[in-house]
Structures are given as structure tokens and as C-alpha cells.
Amino acid sequence: MILSKLITKKPDLKVLIVVPTTNLKEQWSEQIDDLGYSLNCEIQVINTVVTRDWTVDLLILDEIHSFLSTTFAQVFVKVKYKLVLGLTATLERLDGRHEICQKYCPVCDSVPITECIVNGWVSLYKEYLVLIDVDDIDKYK
């Protein structure tokens, strides 16, 4: 994990991990506990982060595609950071707002989905094409 390497080099690093859900907050907490390091680290749900100002050395945004709505993009204003790491498996958005990510947190590395599946980082999945009639869209507006 990137955090363990950073902590060995910079043990005083102040880290803020931002997640979209409480489930992910719990998962991160468990993973950090498993590292066995004492970290100067907070894990917060995005709704909490955008309500106040923060100053950290490292900002980690898990599921960064979730932070690109107008409201949640405020994380880039509310948090003062030296380094930022965004994590996602689905960066591109139909509304084009993934361009915000390129401004604040440009892609520096990616892993092909085949490698992720082989290593057990993602589960097997199926893609389905679901055709809908334009009239159906109007029904649900």
C-alpha cells in the first residue's frame, strides 16, 4: 500500500482520506489498523469534508469520480494539501465533469482491467446493454 511506504519515509505526514460512503470509511479504517502503524490520519465522508476547512500533507480521494459533482468538487477548495492521490476504476463521466479531476488530480498511472481481475483487485463482472425507449425516459423525469 502506498501509505505504508510514505509513512516509513515521512512518519509525521498528516493524511486526510475522503470517501463517498460510511462503508468505505469503515473499510479504510480496517486497512489502516491492519498496517500496524500509528498514522496522523483522518478518514472522513465527503459530506463532512465540504463543511469545513482542512490542512493536510496528503489528500487521498477514494472513488474520486464521486467528488466531481458541483457540490462535492468543493473538496478541492475546502482542503489545503501538498499532495493528492485520487483513486477510481471509473473516471470518465458522461457529463464531462471528469475534466475537473484532470485539473486538480491528473491521471499519472492506470492499470488494465485484465490485470485487476487476475490479481483479485476487482470481481468478475458482466456488461449488459439495456435499450430503453425515449418515451420511457419521459415517464421517469
Which residues does each predicted region cover?
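Short, glycine/charged-enriched secondary-structure capping and boundary segments
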Residues: 2-4, 30-34, 56-57, 73-77, ...
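Conserved catalytic network of the ASCE P-loop NTPase/AAA+ motor domain
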Residues: 8-10, 36-37, 51-54, 76-81, ...
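Inter-Walker segment of RecA-like/P-loop motor cores
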Residues: 18-55
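Conserved RecA-like ASCE ATPase "motif II neighborhood" in helicase/translocase motors
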Residues: 41-75
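Post-DEXD/H (motif II) to motif III coupling segment of the RecA-like Helicase ATP-binding lobe
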Residues: 65-125
